[in-house]
Amino acid sequence: ERVMQSVESPSVKASIKSIINNKPILLMTLSSMLSGFAVGGSKQDYYIDVLNFASLGLITGIPGAIINPFSYMAVPWFRRHFSSRFLYIIGDKISGILLVPVFLVGCIGGKKHGLYKNIWVMGIAMTLWETIFMIFYGVRRIIPTEMYNEAMDYCEWKNGYRTEGMTSVAQGLAQKLSGIVSNYISTWIKQLIGYDLTLYVRGTAQSDSTKFGLFAMFTIIPFITTSLGIIPMLFYDLNDKKKEKMYEELLERRAAMSKEATSGDLEALEKLAKAQMEIGNSKSEL
């Protein structure tokens, strides 16, 4: 069980400072924010208005549903062979990456006679997409959480205290901002391609251009617009060597502070609190 990390709660100014000088959190937040600007359409819109088979997802998702639990068992293997940075990127972008070949296959034949309208061909393509995606599902769920926890340890190492609350608020605001912009642009693009939601209800088909637009919005457009999120993570450098040094120093510091904190001496606690808040000022830039 982890000991109490700080005797005094950091001020708002100190909390903001701890986020600004926490490089791992900044990069992960920026990556998430840029990825959140992804513009795309709904898979269900494509199934309904292009393939005319709203329940196709129930069929294409069967193999992936079987693989899903086993994807968590594969995480240790991925950890041994790849860096956390690579796994974070691949876990976040694997869906878009796999949709690129789906788009290329669907484009065969053009807008009017393209395979993107063929339910059998696209059914197979979507099954492969969902199945391969599920292989990385465990990585997608576990690695970002691990890296977030490491970033909080980095915050403690760098500043002497942890600011999970302020960090969560900052990340949440960034994601909401990008989400609002993304939804607005997606709605605008649907209007641009002439998408009319009421046509399906009236039993009327969308035009070929609109159908292809819905297909592109579901496949290639999200991949293109979310790729910017990769750039910040290329500068993520909390690697094994730095983590080893960080945790070695943290363990020593925690042990010393725990000893002081359990002494029950008020003067010692005040001295400890002051020392914790001054760690960020004395720590060299990393």
Residue positions per predicted region:
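Membrane-embedded alpha-helical bundles of multi-pass transporters/translocases
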Residues: E1-E285
